[in-house]
């Protein structure tokens, strides 16, 4: 690493100490940013990629250990050095356990500081943990679960290549976020990232969007238009819901991928294009191939590198971090002083199955913030389907029959709606007839 290209974030609520460190580190050739609180540090880490964080332990609002853990959740690869005026073994051990690379005793020995900085940055290079050109947190990819770490590792491995990527996952799992992270971490990051949802357009419109059209090619084509392939030339083209395209479009897309050239609608001229293609789908394309609905040759072209998106229920340990992330965003947007969640509300969020995944969680938190009149989000502000989630003791050896679980949810919904069966059924997403049938079992 060239020092002039290394960005260091100093986190300390002592303004004078921050200023001294900034002058010192800049004198050594580093770029330095300052944060006077843990919350300020997190905001900066979300917006910018830092090569190293130097963080004080004792801070008023959010201490250094808590800040360290939150930063690691946002970007596990970033090296963090802890500063403490208290040379207790307990503090050092706690910091190292939380993910700190090393710790420094205040007042700082500047020679020791310089040596520790150089070792930390060298360690980053040696372990191959050179930070990508953009932090995962910038794209909303938040979490420290094994599933999330596996996904981030896949992104780091795949991004340097030009191999076509197929991202598979349920709706709301963040497939476009992964595509954006792949592009940002690739050698094409300074070139365009062009996105298109294939399911949102009919066949003729999709053809025009992908390949462009000549003036007069069809009714309404009053001028020549370049397609998404040409717009993405030199960069990345992300095609979402690729499993929804028609057989004719499958043929045209296959040709574009194989030949690396496209033709505008209404033209015989071919245009060479250089794009990194990333596709995504919620469908099982192997199953679609077996059923004759998707071309096998196109499937093999797309599925060079496969990335499987974990559902939110497969990484429940990330829910508190995600919920807090959305809470801060919507609290700021709505100008509300929200402090957090009640323990009961967080339990409900963790135990709910999230069929709509991260998108559903985001919507639920936005709704809760809008409805909130106090300082903490409780079960009252959560959507009924979540508030009615039964929470069983984790150590319970007995598996409760599904019919009993359904009845518990329905009874909770009825209690919340004052016994109104029609409203309870509506909020649970079932018909009144189904609700009555399940109650009578």
Curated annotation (Swiss-Prot):
One MF term in GO for this entry? ATP hydrolysis activity
Where in the numbering of this chain does the Response regulatory domain appear? 7-121
Location of the DNA-binding region in this protein: 421-440
Keywords on record: Activator, ATP-binding, Cytoplasm, DNA-binding, Nucleotide-binding, Phosphoprotein, Stress response, Transcription, Transcription regulation, Two-component regulatory system
Q: Kindly indicate whether the keyword Phosphoprotein belongs to this entry.
A: yes
Q: Does the keyword DNA-binding apply?
A: yes
Query: Where in this chain does the record put each Sigma-54 factor interaction domain?
Result: 141-370
Question: Where is ATP annotated to bind?
Answer: 172-173, 329, 359
Please give the residue positions where the record annotates the modification 4-aspartylphosphate.
Answer: 56
What is this protein's function per UniProt? Part of the Zra signaling pathway, an envelope stress response (ESR) system composed of the periplasmic accessory protein ZraP, the histidine kinase ZraS and the transcriptional regulator ZraR. The ZraPSR system contributes to antibiotic resistance and is important for membrane integrity in the presence of membrane-targeting biocides. ZraR is a member of the two-component regulatory system ZraS/ZraR. When activated by ZraS, acts in conjunction with sigma-54 to regulate the expression of zraP in the presence of high Zn(2+) or Pb(2+) concentrations.
Q: What is the protein name stated in its UniProt record?
A: Transcriptional regulatory protein ZraR
Q: Which gene encodes it?
A: zraR
């Amino acid at each position: 690493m060239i020092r002039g290209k290394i960005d260091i974030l100093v986190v300390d609520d002592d303004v004078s100490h921050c200023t001294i460190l900034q002058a010192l580190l800049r004198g050594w050739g580093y770029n330095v940013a300052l944060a006077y609180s843990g919350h300020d540090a997190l905001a900066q880490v979300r917006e910018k990629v830092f090569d190293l964080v130097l963080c004080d332990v004792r801070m008023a609002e959010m201490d250094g250990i808590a800040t360290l853990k939150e930063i690691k959740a946002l970007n596990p690869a970033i090296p963090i050095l802890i500063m403490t005026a208290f040379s207790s073994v307990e503090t050092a051990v706690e910091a190292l356990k939380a993910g700190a690379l090393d710790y420094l005793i205040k007042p700082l020995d500047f020679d020791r500081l310089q040596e520790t900085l150089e070792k930390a940055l060298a360690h980053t290079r040696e372990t191959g943990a050179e930070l990508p050109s953009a932090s995962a947190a910038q794209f909303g990819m938040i979490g420290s679960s094994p599933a999330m770490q596996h996904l981030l590792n896949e992104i780091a491995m795949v991004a340097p290549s030009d191999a076509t990527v197929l991202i598979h996952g349920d709706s709301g799992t963040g497939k476009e976020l992964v595509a954006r992270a792949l592009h940002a971490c690739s050698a094409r990051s300074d070139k365009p990232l062009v996105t298109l949802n294939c399911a949102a357009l009919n066949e003729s419109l999709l053809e025009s969007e992908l390949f462009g059209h000549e003036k007069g090619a069809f009714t309404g084509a009053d001028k020549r238009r370049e397609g998404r392939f040409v717009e993405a030339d030199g960069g990345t083209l992300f095609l979402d819901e690729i499993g929804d395209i028609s057989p004719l479009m499958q043929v045209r897309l296959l040709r574009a991928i194989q030949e690396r050239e496209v033709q505008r609608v209404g033209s015989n001229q071919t245009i060479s294009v250089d794009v990194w293609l990333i596709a995504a789908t919620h469908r099982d394309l192997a199953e679609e191939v077996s059923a004759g609905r998707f071309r096998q040759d196109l499937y093999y072209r797309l599925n060079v590198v496969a990335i499987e998106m974990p559902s939110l229920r497969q990484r429940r340990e990330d829910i508190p971090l995600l919920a807090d992330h959305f809470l801060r965003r919507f609290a700021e947007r709505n100008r509300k002083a929200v402090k957090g969640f009640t323990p009961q509300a967080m339990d409900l969020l963790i135990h709910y199955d999230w069929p709509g995944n991260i998108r559903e969680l985001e919507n639920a938190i936005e709704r809760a913030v809008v409805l909130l009149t106090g300082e903490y989000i409780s079960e009252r502000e959560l959507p009924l389907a979540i508030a009615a989630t039964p929470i069983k003791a984790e150590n319970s050896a007995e598996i409760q029959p599904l019919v009993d679980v359904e009845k518990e949810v329905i009874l909770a919904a009825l209690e919340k709606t004052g016994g109104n069966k029609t409203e309870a059924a509506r909020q649970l997403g079932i018909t009144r007839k189904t609700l009555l049938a399940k109650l009578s079992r």
